[in-house]
Amino acid sequence: MNETFSATPRSMTIHRYRMKRGALRRRARDISVMLVVLVCATVVIWTWDRTPTSAFLPPESHYLKLQSEEKVEKLPTALNTETKDSYSSAIPFVNKEESKEDSSDNKDTEEEEEKQVEEVTVSNTNRGKIPTIEEKKGEHEVIASEPKYRKTPTREDFKLEKVKHEVAVGEGEATETTHIKETNSDPKSNILATDEERTDGTSTARITNQACNYAKGKWVVDNHRPLYSGSQCKQWLASMWACRLMQRTDFAFESLRWQPKDCSMEEFEGSKFLRRMKNKTLAFVGDSLGRQQFQSMMCMISGGKERLDVLDVGPEFGFITPEGGARPGGWAYRFPETNTTVLYHWSSTLCDIEPLNITDPATEHAMHLDRPPAFLRQYLQKIDVLVMNTGHHWNRGKLNGNKWVMHVNGVPNTNRKLAALGNAKNFTIHSTVSWVNSQLPLHPGLKAFYRSLSPRHFVGGEWNTGGSCNNTTPMSIGKEVLQEESSDYSAGRAVKGTGVKLLDITALSHIRDEGHISRFSISASRGVQDCLHWCLPGVPDTWNEILFAMI
């Protein structure tokens, strides 16, 4: 009895001990779990505080992207920094290029060549000498020199190294891309914004023109457009671009106005332009799209009215019709009330082209990729605002048809990489922009612009294979251009780091496919449409409005 009684307390003690130990273990486990939860919660809260809300928004790449049919190569180079005196000529400039002008943009073997990974190395010598070009094996890069004056080779080498990272190779990443955003689910309600939007203080932020990126924005309807009549501006406007004189019946495209994002653009007025350009000269140098911009500007200044007082001063700039030629190398007109001159010079490739044998009408022509047009070398000192462009004539059909032979350093090009048309074009753009930049210190009042590529809109083929652009509803409906950099990559890289400004019109023009001459051309062959040039009045007027705001 005593044994039983004595054992019972002991058992109970052991039992209580075990229960207490189990409770402690459970409490320790609960505390551990709470600590783990607390640590995780702390990490989550800390991460949330350090992460901006914008990180959870969809990236810009989710915006709708429109792929242009026109490819923009991106192999930048820069070279010639010679002074204009190196190439000066005392004789008047006469256009040596083929007189016929069309919208041809053959690509035949060009596209295959441009798919190669290209490498071109430009080695600048001392100022005043033509740079040499050599192929570098094993390196997929182009060394683009900064177009600035240098005293020592070491500084030049430093500049060359600095811009290496800006150079791209090949064509794969060079396709023209336009970033746009849907701004309204109802296209009509968006595009049919009234011109009251212009004066609404809440519609645009009032920031300075210098800070405005005019390439960003949207197209809206303005009841005050167009700025001139396409049927009345016959003094300046070629009939092949005056769609009012054709069989086209829809002209809603004439009423669209470009509205930059977050800033206002100064209204264009002919009288205001002439006052701003008093005793100055505006020069357009480029291809047929440059000529369209020139004719647009003349119509905008005059309001489409006949101006008998305007003087033809073409001979002052060497614009004479060569013997047997169809037209001069350009046109120049002067508004006497302000002594303002507006001119256009035909230079489809923006480089120097000269006959190899001046006595032979059938001779080949040297196409000097590293020399600016002879016109610029001779008349730059007379120009106050310069607008350059090139692009659509860089195809095998043009080169072969005009008997143009690529030259570098004064001799035929032997660099097979540079012979690819995409590389040759970009090489030339960088060369000419670099040369103009080197001239800016010599002409402090000169404002120079390079206009980006005007897009083509051929659908279902090319200009000679059934390509068309019959759309009459603009792609701009309900969309807004948002990209920061130009769709024309080559143009953007060419002007970077120079005093030459970019007149970026590619993206805003890309969403205006309805503005081309299309099938209504009065000179086109049956079945051939013009989806390269624009109806005037039209999109090129906006290019000039932006130019006016920038000068």
Curated annotation (Swiss-Prot):
Residues 95-107 have a biased composition (Basic and acidic residues). A motif (GDS motif) lies at residues 286-288. It is found in: Membrane. A motif (DCXHWCLPGXXDXWN motif) lies at residues 530-544. InterPro entries: TBL_C, TBL_N. GO terms for molecular function: transferase activity. Residues 78-89 have a biased composition (Polar residues). One of its GO terms (cellular component) is Golgi trans cisterna. The chain crosses the membrane at residues 31-48. It is a single-pass type II membrane protein. GO terms for biological process: xylan biosynthetic process. Belongs to the PC-esterase family. TBL subfamily. Contains 2 motifs that are conserved in esterases, but it is unlikely that this protein belongs to the catalytically active pectin esterases. May act as a bridging protein that binds pectin and other cell wall polysaccharides. Probably involved in maintaining esterification of pectins. May be involved in the specific O-acetylation of cell wall polymers. PANTHER family: N-ACETYLNEURAMINATE 9-O-ACETYLTRANSFERASE, PROTEIN TRICHOME BIREFRINGENCE-LIKE 14. This is Protein trichome birefringence-like 16. It comes from Arabidopsis thaliana (Mouse-ear cress).
